[in-house]
UniProtKB/Swiss-Prot annotation:
Region named Disordered: 1-33, 104-125
Residues binding Zn(2+), per UniProt: C122
Gene this chain is encoded by: BEX1
Protein name: Protein BEX1
Organism this protein belongs to: Homo sapiens
Tissue-wise expression: Expressed in central nervous system, with high level in pituitary, cerebellum and temporal lobe. Expressed in lung, skeletal muscle, peripheral blood leukocyte, stomach, lymph node, trachea and bone marrow. Highly expressed in acute myeloid leukemia.
Record's keyword terms, sorted: Cytoplasm, Developmental protein, Differentiation, Metal-binding, Neurogenesis, Nucleus, Phosphoprotein, Ubl conjugation, Zinc
Length: 125
């Protein structure tokens, strides 16, 4: 009987100790967080104990995460420039193809040459 009573007392004391520890953790967690992300690279400094506050590590991780999540701005600009340059090259190639085609069709056609084409020459006397 005594061993059962001792076990019951031990289990009650353990439960009380666990509840006290949980209450202490809840009180400790109610304090302000160490760092809160605001904007890119900005963090809120807590008003409490500033000795425990480490600025460098969270900011480095946050900036690294932001760079890999959003992509580097230079890389995005390079992609946009490549798309724009590719479009310009495509338009120039299309214009060049049209001019070459028009010159080849004019050489085959039977229409008399117009006087505004100074780069053409005529072999007729």
């Amino acid at each position: 009987m005594e061993s059962k009573e001792k076990r019951a007392v031990n289990s009650l004391s353990m439960e009380n100790a666990n509840q006290e520890n949980e209450e202490k953790e809840q009180v400790a967690n109610k304090g302000e967080p160490l760092a809160l992300p605001l904007d890119a690279g900005e963090y809120c400094v807590p008003r409490g104990n500033r000795r425990r506050f480490r600025v460098r590590q969270p900011i480095l991780q946050y900036r690294w995460d932001m760079m890999h999540r959003l992509g580097e701005p230079q890389a995005r600009m390079r992609e946009e420039n490549m798309e724009r340059i590719g479009e310009e090259v495509r338009q120039l190639m299309e214009k060049l193809r049209e001019k070459q085609l028009s010159h080849s069709l004019r050489a085959v056609s039977t229409d008399p040459p117009h006087h505004d084409h100074h780069d053409e020459f005529c072999l007729m006397p």
